[in-house]
Swiss-Prot record:
GO biological process: cGMP biosynthetic process
Gene name of this polypeptide: GC1
Name of the molecule in the record: Guanylyl cyclase 1
Enzyme Commission number(s) from the entry: 4.6.1.2
This protein's record includes keyword Lyase: yes
Pathway assigned to this chain's UniProt record: Nucleotide metabolism
Organism name: Arabidopsis thaliana (Mouse-ear cress)
Length: 274
């Protein structure tokens, strides 16, 4: 078995992230580098790996202004946490020029502002199978071509997309390192009921069980409670905590592709003198 300190060092080698991409069939088209080498973490004993039992990053809360701009609000939270204050939701919306926001759109926004991040998904491109979901039905035919083109142009634009699932343990370890936050695509209907009752934006949550795509920022983890701290752009609460099980169910729901943008916030703050 590898020493735990060696595993931790492998976890934090984000600087080498720009060496890989996978196509939609899982075939490697460029030399691949995987940010995570599945950490051997069990029973929440993070102290043994030199990690604290809890950690959170200071991320200012930003409310979304419409039912479709939660992803833009999450990007704005990342920018403000990085020390980039000269930007608004309206600015980001103008750059995107669409109100059908996909994770790849958020990746291009982060790239435009020189944010260091890693992009993970289990599906390369837009999944046509989502046409059966009410959430995607109206926009998907139009989005298929646009989104697929963004994926195809990602590598030449400097965006590395890794086609793999990221475990909840990997996410918790990176958060406990105190250097990272994440933007995650989740199914809002699978989040806790008590949390959803606090949403500000009307019409965002319904009583049915259909998939409702939503973006949140994950900015902390408590290993003792097994809870993640998040920033929800639709919530009236600035600080939210959610159980590991609830987050896992919400982000692995059919429709999310397990999309995850992992941001090295510490490096960004150092670069911006924040």
């Amino acid at each position: 078995m590898w020493p735990l300190c060696f595993l931790l060092n492998k976890l934090l080698r984000v600087e080498e992230r720009n060496q890989g991409i996978l196509d939609g069939n899982g075939d490697s088209t460029f030399p691949k580098y995987c940010l995570f080498d599945d950490p051997l973490v069990s029973d929440g004993k993070y102290r043994d790996a030199g990690l604290p039992s809890s950690s959170h990053m200071d991320v200012p809360h930003v409310h979304q202004l419409a039912s479709w701009d939660c992803g833009l609000a999450c990007v704005l939270m990342v920018l403000r946490a990085s020390g980039i204050a000269s930007c608004t939701l309206e600015d980001l919306a103008e750059i995107c020029s669409t109100n059908s926001i996909w994770t790849v759109d958020l990746a291009y926004l982060l790239q435009k502002f020189c944010v260091e991040f890693s992009y993970y998904t289990i599906t390369f491109g837009a999944n046509p199978n989502y046409s059966i979901e009410e959430f995607y039905k109206e926009q998907l035919p139009e989005d298929l071509v646009r989104v697929d083109l963004l994926f195809r142009k990602a590598h030449e634009s400097g965006i590395i997309i890794q086609c793999r699932s990221v475990s909840i343990h990997e996410i918790s370890c990176l958060l406990l390192s105190g250097n990272y936050i994440a933007i995650a695509l989740v199914d809002q209907d699978k989040l806790s009921k008590s949390w959803l009752e606090e949403v500000l934006v009307s019409g965002l949550h319904s009583s049915n069980s259909c998939y409702t795509g939503h973006y949140v920022v994950i900015c902390g983890y408590d290993a003792v409670r097994d809870e993640f701290e998040i920033r929800d752009p639709a919530s009236s609460k600035i600080h939210e905590r959610i159980s590991s099980k609830c987050l896992e169910n919400a982000r692995k729901s059919f429709g999310t592709d397990e999309d995850l943008l992992l941001i090295n916030l510490e490096n960004m703050r150092n670069q911006n003198g924040y």
